[in-house]
Each structure stands twice: as structure tokens, then as C-alpha cells.
């Protein structure tokens, strides 16, 4: 009888119930809410499902993120080894490879002025940097936080790892991916506030056809120009353009399919679960996290507003040939931001098709955010 009692006692002690804190319960509830948003409402399920499940796991069983050096036998937890790939900036670079293989830069090549809209939307990054500095974050932490304004999760993780801001990598990544998934909710009110109905109804001229030679030369030229000026951008811009060259060359179909499908989804699983696993109650439930989330929202709103306002300027300069709504697509949430531009434009005029025009600033924003990250790395002397 005593043996049975001891055995049952040991079993009870091994359950998670004995170690759950109020903070863990709060984070479990947050994880379930994210799963609900992803599954029930379809808010970027490819991102939110693995992130939320990683969040769920680490708050039930913290040792799944146990660092190898803290382990009695020298073996870390499963998700710790996934997370190491985040710290080393391997997974974000592979994400860019997959994104490049999936991206059509044709609208940007056909309308190079889109680069200006993509650049304007990066204003949110530098606004967030100043805001983070004002809130008491160090200069490197402020730089890592500011990339949230570009709505670019992989770049946020990449820069946080490079600047050795791993203590806030979890909140940064969760905020960035959350705002990426909430683009359809956050952007429309800002877009409607800053534009008139007449502006939203503007129809743009059809884009010119882009030749195969232009498509092949584009990733090569961008790599040479950007990586020569800012070599620190090579891991992101280089991988992005390599993936696109796979796609546009037409001679490595197997590599294109692998990079844009199997490899991409494997990396998303590893990245999402490991990022979610950094959100233990002890690491996440603090004032710094609230500041980061608030700064991210402000930065994203500023970036959207800056893009729309620059779009209005281009509309005025071209005498009404540019719909300002495409400026909001300058953030690098691809293709969600472009779809939002299309949706808001169609609400004003159902016959208005802005999607391809918005894709130009959208893909320019991806390059712009990577360049912003490279600029911060150059400023701090990080390679």
C-alpha cells in the first residue's frame, strides 16, 4: 500500500499542475486565443498556429526550452535547438530564400517609382527607434524593436540575433508576427482616415509587360548594388534574390519548388515553434514586453501612414495617376498589405483593381526593411 501511495505521489509531482503559476495560465490562455484567431478566423494560420503552439508547450513544460549548459546531462530541450537556429540567423535567411522563390518582382520592375513608396513606409522603423530610445531601451535594443514597424518577422528575428538582443527576441518576434497577421484590421482605418473617397476611387494605368531578361537581371543587379553598399544585408537580400533568380531563370525548377514549398514550410514550423517557445511567463509577462508591443503598433501605424501620405504626394505630382492607397502596401507584409490596398480600393469602387500596382511597393518594402536592418548593423559595427 505504501509503495502504491509513493508511486502515485511521484506521478502527481511529475505533472505540470504542480509547477503551473498564474503567469503560465495567462500565457496558456493567450496561446489558445492565438489558436482561435488562426483557426476560426484565418488570421495568418501558417504563422500563428506554430507560434501559439510553441507558446503553449513552453508554459506547460518549460524544460522543452532548457539550454544545454543548464542541463544536468548536457542535453537541451527540443525547441532550444530550434531556437539556436534563430540566434544564428539561419532560419530568417532561409525564410527569405523561400520568399524570393515565391515573389514576382514584375510590378516593381514595371513601375520603379514603387521603390519610393516602399522606402517611405520604412519611416515607421525609425520612428519606433526614437520611441524605444525615449522609453529607456539601449540603442541596440531600440534598433531590434524598431524593425517591427516594417511588419517583417524574419528580419526582426535576424536583427535581434545579430545585435545580441536575445532576451527580447521573443516579444519582438511575437509582436512582429502578430501585427503581420492583423494587417487587415490595423491598416484600413488609417488608410481611410488619410484619403478622400475620390482618391480611393482613382484607377491606375495598366502596368507594362516585363521581359524575361529584365526579370533575370533584376535579382543580380539588386544583389550587386545593395550588397556592395551595405554588405551586412547579404544574408537577407542575397537569399531573397537567390530565391527569385531560381524562379525567374526557369532552369532550376526543382530548386524553385523546394525553396518555395517544402523548405519554406519546414523552416516556418521550426521558426514559429521556437519563437513561440521564447514566451515563457517569466520572460514575457513584464513591462518591457508591453512597451515592445505598444512600440510595434505605433511603428506599424506610422509606417502605414507614411506610405499613404507619400502616395498622396505622388498622386499630386502625377496629377491623379497614382492611387494613394498603394502606399500603405510599402510595409513588407507580403502579400497581405497589397491585398488590403485592393480591398479598400474595391470598397470605394468595385471595378478598381489595385492589387498588382500595390505589389510593387509591397515587394519594395521587403527589400527596404532588409536594408534598414543592414543599416543598423553597419551603424553598430556588426557583421
Model-derived segments and spans:
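Alpha-helical transmembrane segments
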Residues: 167-185, 295-303, 326-327
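Entry/N-cap segments of selected transmembrane alpha helices
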Residues: 32, 108-129, 280-307, 358-362
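Intrinsically disordered, low-complexity non-transmembrane regions of multi-pass membrane transporters
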Residues: 1-19, 25, 71, 75, ...
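Membrane-embedded hairpin module used as a gating/binding unit in multi-pass transport
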Residues: 175-251
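Alpha-helical membrane segments and immediately flanking helix-loop junctions
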Residues: 88, 96-102, 117-127, 131, ...
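Transmembrane helical segments that form the transport core of multi-pass membrane transport proteins
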Residues: 223-310
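N-terminal alpha-helical transmembrane segments of multi-pass membrane transport
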Residues: 1-74
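Interfacial helix-loop-helix linkers and transmembrane-helix boundary segments
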Residues: 39-48, 66-67, 81-82, 102-117, ...
